[in-house]
Curated annotation (Swiss-Prot):
Signal peptide: none
Protein name: Thiamine thiazole synthase
Quaternary structure note: Homooctamer; tetramer of dimers.
EC number(s) per entry: 2.4.2.59
Source organism of the structure: Pyrococcus abyssi (strain GE5 / Orsay)
Amino acid sequence: MLREVTISRAIIESYYRDLLNNLELDVAIVGAGPSGMVAAYYLAKGGAKVAIFEKKLSIGGGIWGGGMGFNKVVVQEEAREILDEFDIRYEEFEKGYYVADAIEVATTIASKTVKAGVKIFNMIEVEDLVVKDNRVSGIVINWTPVLMTGLHVDPLTVEAKYVIDSTGHGAQVAQFLLKRGLIERIPGEGAMWAEQGERLTVENTREVFPGLYVTGMAANAIAGAPRMGPIFGGMFLSGKKAAQEILEKLNL
């Protein structure tokens, strides 16, 4: 006989264990888009304890819709090895341009990331940062519906040696530092220029404040660099770069 209360208990107890197990992390990633998930995958493969916090119900960021709802994405030659790493199928459109199914990209990266040992917490929004001794040392979290409805509910905190802002165009995590005068400015992304946008996304992936990295479009927003549209190689390479640098700093 199926008992409703047993179903409830199974969900509550297993989620409770997951949350408790991820209150102290090597790396907390904010945003489960392409750069955030790729960073998490390589971090976990390298031995780091990592979790992703995504404010939306679904993960994947801007992958799903491809370009203008045509659910295909393009990846350039430099990032093709990451498609191979994730066993994502693709076809060559022209030399150096590879086309993949957006749904396969989103679901495969998510699945492989979770199977690498990453816990993804969806419907949890980061509303602030923990900053101690001039270093980011954790995130302040609350349920997305609580923040959406404006209810006065105090948050909880997660401790992390490093935090990655993978929130995309708004660089929402870095904004908390800007608001407190801990970084000088966030100019926002520039106009569309795919070639420069892709190159600079990787170049701008860095530690912008002790303990805080930026990846993907958040990296370009911090630097005022161009957007690039539905080409995702830069996102993937950005996530991998951040993971490699953090693993080195963690001595893993």
